[in-house]
Swiss-Prot record:
Gene3D superfamilies: Met repressor-like, Replication modulator SeqA, C-terminal DNA-binding domain. GO terms for biological process: negative regulation of DNA-templated DNA replication initiation; regulation of DNA-templated transcription. The lineage of its organism: Bacteria, Pseudomonadati, Pseudomonadota, Gammaproteobacteria, Enterobacterales. It comes from the Bacteria. Its main location: cytoplasm. This is Negative modulator of initiation of replication. Keywords: Cytoplasm, DNA replication inhibitor, DNA-binding. Homodimer. Polymerizes to form helical filaments. Belongs to the SeqA family. Negative regulator of replication initiation, which contributes to regulation of DNA replication and ensures that replication initiation occurs exactly once per chromosome per cell cycle. Binds to pairs of hemimethylated GATC sequences in the oriC region, thus preventing assembly of replication proteins and re-initiation at newly replicated origins. Repression is relieved when the region becomes fully methylated. The keyword DNA-binding applies. GO terms for cellular component: cytoplasm. GO terms for molecular function: sequence-specific DNA binding.
């Protein structure tokens, strides 16, 4: 698989043509250009130099591809509870862009309480009934005593704050 950087306008155009969660960028482009598998092999691709993954932030397009891979994985499918899927997606979002996640986590809150924090005690100050849990592989905690629809809204708002397109954020949040 090759990594291609596209500008925001082109990305949004491609993302708008996503038909289902889990659809790869290659599938979308093949459909848009009416390419078959055979024609794809005829396209010559200029090799790019190897880039150290740790030194490059994931582009928006590649971040969506990674999310699609997670959503179509056996691991995600095996998660039977909303909270387990919610936590897996939050953990993945942090892995994709920890700085954007941090900014989003600090800005998202309800009328009377915070949803995310770097401290369990901070969330407990807003009410002992919030049942904070640590998001796996992150320094963040999230309240978990909310209903499924609130979790979907929290996830969607997190993704929008991280600059994911609204359509993608909505589709991902509906999977939990």
């Amino acid at each position: 698989m090759k990594l291609i950087e596209v500008d925001e306008e082109l990305y949004r155009y491609i993302a708008a043509h996503t038909q289902y969660i889990g659809e790869s960028a290659s599938e979308i482009l093949r459909r848009m250009f009416s390419l078959t598998q055979k024609k794809q092999t005829e396209i010559k691709i200029k090799k790019t130099p190897k880039i150290h993954q740790s030194s490059v932030k994931a582009t928006l397009f590649s971040r969506i591809q990674i999310l699609n891979d997670i959503l179509s994985s056996e691991t995600y499918a095996s998660k039977n509870k909303v909270i387990a899927r919610f936590m897996l997606i939050l953990s993945t979002l942090y892995d994709l862009d920890s700085k954007a996640f941090s900014v989003a986590a600090e800005s998202l809150q309800g009328r009377k309480r915070a949803y995310f924090s770097g401290s369990k005690n901070f969330l407990l100050k807003n009410g002992t009934h919030t049942k904070p849990k640590q998001i796996p592989k992150t320094p963040y905690w999230v309240i978990t005593n909310t209903n499924s629809e609130r979790k979907r809204t929290m996830l969607k708002n997190m993704m929008i704050a991280m600059k994911f397109p609204n359509e993608i954020a909505k589709k991902v949040s509906q999977t939990i």
